[in-house]
A protein has these predicted regions:
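A well-structured
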Residues: 5-168
Length: 168
């Protein structure tokens, strides 16, 4: 079994032998422009997501009472998660493509911080859905787009503790 010192030595040797990304044939690299054409477009998408999350939180937090609101909310939530995933992929793939790129590392770290904050703002949604009456969720389940999600939510709901029990 290798010691920590041996692993560190192996890693240093491996990293010394790595070629620079600029030396790699462009046909062997990821083209991240399919996600965002430019850094500016990426930054605009991140700002757009921040605004959409704020609006979503204002519109839905403490306001979901009907099956229609559940369905519209879930459609919006899916779109937010899709945009979030694209932003996250762009940052993480840029770092994976070139681990020596300090700019990409900084952008990824800053973006992860922003996304964590947005995730916290969105966390109310699934929690509030799980607190809805089963009849409302069953009605919302009629929407094919939401059926599987709501089916799982109803199943998970059986195992949730009440707010009073959670508080103790």
């Amino acid at each position: 079994m290798k010691t920590v010192v041996q692993w560190e030595y192996d890693f240093r040797k491996w990293s010394e032998n790595m070629i620079e990304r600029s030396q790699v044939d462009v046909n062997q690299t990821w083209d991240l422009s399919h996600l965002f054409k430019t850094e500016e477009v990426f930054n605009e998408a991140l700002e757009d997501l921040k605004g959409k999350v704020e609006a979503f939180q204002k519109e839905y937090e403490g306001q979901i009472t009907t099956a229609h609101q559940v369905n519209v909310g879930l459609a919006t939530y899916r779109a937010l998660l899709e945009q979030r995933g694209k932003i996250s992929a762009y940052c993480n793939l840029a770092v994976s493509a070139n681990t020596r790129d300090k700019e990409a590392q900084t952008r990824a770290a800053q973006t992860r911080t922003v996304l964590a904050g947005l995730d916290a703002k969105l966390s109310f949604f699934e929690s509030e859905l799980s607190q809805l009456d089963d009849a409302v969720l069953e009605e919302a389940r009629a929407n094919k787009e939401d059926a599987l999600y709501i089916e799982r939510l109803l199943e998970d709901k059986k195992h949730l503790l009440s707010k009073d029990v959670e508080a103790t």
